[in-house]
């Protein structure tokens, strides 16, 4: 479900927030930490008072009220950066189970939707069944801090911690993507990051959007795309992305280097407000330390060293097109508290937390990597694909046509209808592919790694034909797309996996414009 908090000056309602101890708690919170006694846990400290750190602190204190829990936050109480936070329905369900009163407080101020909208070249394409939630970051922090303080957590603002204080039974590091503690422990954690080539800038606007909306605009400099969603009655998040060439051609690189630390790039905000004037209704873009950056995907093979657990952006990030770092950090916090509950020692709890949560985050990062690759190259897709096919391509960045059909059958049927209208009434996988030999191909007979053989014809790498295989899925499919744009027949070779519906994947790749012909390879043979 979608959640949004509105009034900037809102304070949590006392009847909900102030009497946590007298209200029924979630079933697992009512129990103790099991064999991990309060004495063994001793003192808990959390470095970082963002949503992940506050959630961890409140859950640990609430479950074990005699344990001292202290949060150190470097910023003052009312300062925050950014605009809104997006949650999935699954995240909200997890929060409801862990902290039902907090969930209720947020939901009561919700802005909900499940339809995602694309705007490009004068057309609008919508796909439903995408349940999410969004909230103003300042309001989220107000709710979480009130909860934490009310259950007995000590929150110290304006506390810049340079060294981890000794003596705690458990330390939770939730100090964000620029964590100095992660950097110091990088070798033990096996921490690394990769940086994208494309540019993005995080803004706000008073323009109203009904739900998650993606406007795309072609300019003389190149194509700009935006992620927009409401976070309150009068405020929306507005994130703009473009490739490096577009950023430079628009002259946005010159303004970036002149900005002082912490300032917003007002020149870029003005340029982008003009670019997206139609979607913004002529309203300006608002800054809050809004600067151009390149997205960094952070990973770590370990999240624990000694009695220190790292959560959130300090050890993992995923591109915001598939999920927010805030929601991932809060999910980490819930998982950490649950691990402490069921394990017989702090070391065992930290190992369980690390093992279980790393696998969950790995899966999300794989999806995010594919989506990030799409956002690195969306400009050429915008210019070369018809709007309906661009929409299919966009919505199948990380899922298949079959997945979308379960969410919104009408969206997929509309795309198939356009396909049939342009292919003589053929369904996607029954559409013949004409060859120079005069043969109409519907199904590949055999693929031996270099040649796709059908009765009466062979397709191999040659002028006019491109067989694309190996490399990562995102790179492979992007190369096939480019081959099509260059006027070649793109034969996309995909690995055959038992869990994959081959017809569903083939239809996805063809209907989205990624390939003309799809072969599935298992030990060099079609399966």
Regions found by a protein language model. Give the residues of each.
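Extreme N-terminal leader/targeting segments of oxidoreductases
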Residues: 7-10, 14-43, 62-66, 433-462, ...
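C-terminal helical "tail/cap" subdomain of flavin- and related membrane-associated enzymes
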Residues: 25-28, 34-40, 338-464
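Conserved N-terminal helical subregion
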Residues: 37-41, 88-202, 421-428
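Conserved mid-domain beta->alpha element of the FAD-binding
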Residues: 46-62, 203, 291-370
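Conserved Rossmann-like nucleotide-cofactor binding loop
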Residues: 52, 77, 178
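Glycine-rich FAD pyrophosphate-binding loop
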Residues: 61-81
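Conserved N-terminal glycine-rich FAD pyrophosphate-binding loop of Rossmann-like flavoproteins
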Residues: 76-94
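Conserved FAD/dinucleotide-binding core of flavoprotein oxidoreductases
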Residues: 127-130, 212-294
